Amino acid sequence: MLALLLTGIHVQAQKLKPSELAHTFSIVARDSKTGEMAVGVQSHWFSVGTSVSWAEAGVGAIATQSFTNKSFGIRGLALLKEGRTAQQALDQLLADDEGRDVRQVAIVDARGNVAAHTGKKCIQFADHITGDQFSVQSNMMLTDKVNSAMAEAFKASSGMPIAERVLAALNAAEAEGGDIRGKQSAAILVVPAKSEGKPWEERTTDLRVDDHKTPLVELGRLLKVQQAYEHMNAGDLAVELNDMPKAMQEYGTAMKMQPENLEMQYWTAVTLVNNKEIAKAVPMFKKIFKADKNWKELTKRLPAVGLLSTTESELARILAL
């Protein structure tokens, strides 16, 4: 294991373990328009997102990698909450860490300040580039072109949602060779500009691919799935506001994005029934039940809990499909 090769690196008070290895490329960034903050990462190591990426709404985003000090995530965010800038927080973290020479860290705070550090004993190619409200960093890369590719891709995608910009940067890094060992896992984490005091709701995007032959491809697929579900959620909100045309528009967009997703079709059909549009719902139910009979069984159970409002005869018509 790579950790066994570190005997020549004297790191006092820090016992390096294989679980702390995250030789990788990443980006931390803030959207100048929305204020959202994000971390994106890919590595040839299992479940990299659980070690490298940290973010909190209204506070900042942190990537901690190379020979990872996970505490930098929690402690760094705490320092930002105390009012430190990204640079001040980074300086404090490094001052307390005798393993700083093998660390790579980047921080963006809620005001858009950026700070980054690449230890002098990080494995080459290793470096970072900071720009306007973003930082890209990498170590153990195949070539020295990875960081510049990430930076240019992020800047070129201005105007797109931050999650898509982060993914574009990661794809650009991989196109330049990426991690010299290959690829295994990836993650994107996005948080809002401000906190509403509900941390359980304050991760706009939280996607991880822990073990995959092409993790960025899979991460991109998951991002599209999430976007489809966001349209479903927007449709649900429109129903609550009694705006059925808007609801059906949102549901329709979601189903076009995920045409094989029976769940989206099913709840759209249920909404139609609840809105007294059973004629439109029937062909949808017929298609769904043919694909998977369990949805018919579920339909029987919905009236009892108030999720399907219909007459007995209409319910019988649906169940007879």
What are these language model-derived features?
Residues 259, 293-294:
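Short coil turns that delineate tetratricopeptide repeat
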Residues 233, 267, 301-302:
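Canonical tetratricopeptide repeat
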Residues 264, 298-299:
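TPR alpha-solenoid repeat register
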Residues 236-237, 270, 304:
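Residue-level recognition of tetratricopeptide repeat
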Residues 240, 274-275, 308:
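Register position in tetratricopeptide repeats
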Residues 14-181, 210-243, 256:
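Alpha/propeptide regions of enzymes that mature by internal proteolysis
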